[in-house]
From Swiss-Prot:
It is an enzyme of class 4 (lyase). This is Enolase. The gene is eno. It is found in: Cytoplasm; Secreted; Cell surface. Catalyzes the reversible conversion of 2-phosphoglycerate (2-PG) into phosphoenolpyruvate (PEP). It is essential for the degradation of carbohydrates via glycolysis. It catalyses: (2R)-2-phosphoglycerate = phosphoenolpyruvate + H2O. Its cofactor is Mg(2+).
Length: 414
């Protein structure tokens, strides 16, 4: 048995220049694992707490409290634990915090330790992380959900919907699917420049131009897909992030106020006109009646993903399954606080035929943990931004490495 011999954490920077937690775990044989915790901008109200210092440093965004919690409170409790018993470690972290949302220690403290320990254990066994976490059945390369036009909370523009994405289904390998996205992305930049639009990038590497409405980005994507020669092989996915513009029982966008029913009909019209295969957070996180209606209307036609709705929480997802809200769940480890809790949510979804989408956050780093995690859990889909900015391409490049060992791309079988 190898045990945890040393734990330490310190501040590093994420892709927005804000501090975040980096944790390092050393085992009794000298194996080391490290992990950097991401941070979201558009967040669900029921997410696990990201502990910030709220003082004068970094505009209040420092994480020295979370770092101290790792170096003192957590380290004292987990030194000597079996490094290969991830469940025991994560349950210990949860019990040590004593709340249901990590409001004492901070999910940015617990997740960093959880991820770093998994990495150290994999290193000790000489295994890639995806194989250690997923076992012999970890083999499926996910279909990327690439966010190439940014809006909402991820961009400084006038577009309400947060993400306009493309999904390359019609390919037999991950590398060929990724190539199609690259080619479409390059064409999109030229289209925007030629039409006098900004080619500035949003938080997730997608372009962030001002556009007439929430339909114009879809038209742009359709034009670029056609010019690249990938019609019928690449589809469109949307992250509406509608909680961000929901107020007083209405959805305020494009200068108008929409009811839930109005917005659902808008989605029905969009799906009839465009090859849309997935809509994420189409309604607000607490608009439960609306979610039930949306699922009744479109749930047998397209993927309806709950992000703010479920926040990677097993108990909340279970309620959603019972009420028949959505048919897929976004998986963000930092929403729930440990690797084990994340895996439990994925397994619950898969047992109930809900699809899973592994996801980054808008505040990211060069850490590619979620690439391995997506393969480990056979989620079949991954969201990790556009093919720009190193914190995004790190995940794609890691998946290209994994493909050298495991070449089953889900593609049209999704």
């Amino acid at each position: 048995m190898l045990v945890i011999e040393d734990v330490r954490a310190y501040e590093v920077l994420d892709s927005r220049g804000n501090p975040t937690v980096k944790a390092e775990v050393t085992l009794s044989d000298g194996s080391v694992g490290a992990a950097i915790v991401p941070s979201g901008a558009s967040t669900g109200s029921k997410e696990a707490l990201e502990l910030r210092d709220n003082d004068e440093r970094f505009g209040g965004k420092g994480v020295l409290k979370a770092v101290a919690n790792v170096n003192e409170t957590i380290a004292d409790e987990i030194l000597g634990l079996d490094a290969f018993n991830q469940t025991q470690l994560d349950d210990t972290l949860r019990e040590l915090d004593g709340t249901n949302n990590y409001s004492n220690l901070g999910a940015n403290a617990t997740l960093g330790v959880s991820m770093a320990t998994a990495r150290a254990a994999a290193a000790a066994l000489g295994m890639p992380l995806y194989r250690y976490l997923g076992g012999a059945n970890a083999s499926i390369l996910p279909v990327p959900m690439c966010n190439i036009i940014n809006g909402g909370a991820h961009a400084n523009n006038n577009v309400d919907f947060q993400e306009f994405m493309i999904m390359p289904f019609g390919f037999t390998s991950f590398k060929e699917a990724l190539r199609s996205v690259c080619e479409i992305y390059v064409i999109l930049k030229k289209e925007l420049a030629n039409s006098g639009h900004s080619t500035a990038l949003g938080d997730e590497g997608g372009f962030a131009p001002n556009l007439a409405n929430n339909t114009e980005p879809i038209d742009l994507l359709m034009t670029c897909i056609k010019k690249a020669g990938y019609e019928n092989r690449v589809k469109i996915a949307l992250d509406v992030a509608s909680t961000e513009f929901f107020k007083d029982g209405k959805y305020h966008m494009e200068g108008k106020a929409f009811s839930s029913e109005d917005l659902i009909e808008r989605y029905v019209e969009l799906c009839a006109k465009y090859p849309i295969c997935s809509i994420e957070d189409g309604l607000a996180e607490n608009d439960f009646e609306g979610w039930i209606k949306l699922t009744e209307k479109l749930g047998n036609k397209i993927q309806l993903v709950g992000d703010d709705l479920f926040v990677t929480n097993e108990d909340i997802l279970r309620e959603g399954i019972i009420k028949k809200m959505a048919n897929a769940v976004l998986i963000k480890p930092n929403q729930i606080g440990t690797i084990t809790q994340t895996m439990r949510t994925v397994r619950l979804a898969q047992r109930n035929n809900y699809k899973c989408v592994m996801s980054h956050r808008s505040g990211e780093s060069e850490d590619a943990f979620i690439a391995d995690f997506a393969v480990a859990l056979n989620t079949g889909q991954i969201k990790t931004g556009a093919l720009a900015r190193g914190e995004r391409t790190a995940k794609y490049n890691r998946l290209l490495e994994i493909e050298l060992e495991s070449d089953e791309y889900l593609g049209e079988k999704l």
